C-alpha cells in the first residue's frame, strides 16, 4: 500500500520526492518470494527478518538514480490492520496501485507528529483536511482511540 509523499500527490498535495513509502504485509516464510520480485536489488534477509519481528522498515536504493523505496511492515494492531484493509486500488499513470485511504493518511500524519511537530507535516494535515472526501468522524474516532494529540488541527472540523 503506497503511503507518504506519493499518496499526498495522489490526494492533490504536490510534493517532490526521491522515495516511495510502501506498507506491506510480509511473513518470514515469504521473504524469498518477496526478494524475487526485485531481481536487480540486494536485500539482507536477516535485516528483513528482524524488521518483520519488530514491525519496522527496510529499504532498497537504485544506485544509478538514488531513488529509494522504504518498505514498512504493517503493524499488528487493530487500527493498522483496519487501515490496511481500507486501502484503495487506483490507476495512476497506467499503473494500478493500492494506496492508503485519505482518512488513514491524515491519521498517519497525526501519528507522525506525535514525535516532532514539523511545519511540513502540520501543513500536510491542514491541506488534507481541506479535502471534502474526508470522513472527519472516522478520523476523530481513531485519534481518540489511539490517544493521539491532535494539536488543535481538528478543532474546526
Residue ranges of model-derived segments:
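Compositionally biased terminal segments of proteins
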Residues: 1-157
Amino acid at each position: 500500500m503506497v503511503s507518504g509523499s506519493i499518496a499526498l500527490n495522489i490526494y492533490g498535495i504536490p510534493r517532490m520526492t526521491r522515495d516511495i513509502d510502501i506498507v506491506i504485509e510480509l511473513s518470514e516464510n515469504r521473504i524469498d518470494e518477496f526478494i524475487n520480485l526485485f531481481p536487480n536489488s540486494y536485500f539482507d534477509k536477516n535485516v528483513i527478518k528482524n524488521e518483520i519481528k519488530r514491525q519496522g522498515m527496510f529499504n532498497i536504493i537504485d544506485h544509478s538514480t538514488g531513488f529509494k523505496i522504504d518498505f514498512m511492515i504493517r503493524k499488528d494492531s487493530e487500527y493498522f490492520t483496519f487501515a490496511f484493509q481500507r486501502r484503495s486500488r487506483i490507476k495512476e499513470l497506467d499503473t494500478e496501485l493500492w494506496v492508503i485511504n485519505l482518512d488513514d493518511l491524515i491519521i498517519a500524519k497525526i501519528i507522525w507528529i506525535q514525535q516532532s511537530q514539523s511545519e511540513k507535516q502540520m501543513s500536510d494535515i491542514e491541506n488534507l483536511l481541506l479535502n471534502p472526501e474526508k470522513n472527519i468522524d472516522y478520523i476523530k474516532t481513531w485519534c481518540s482511540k489511539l490517544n493521539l494529540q491532535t494539536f488543535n488541527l481538528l478543532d474546526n472540523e
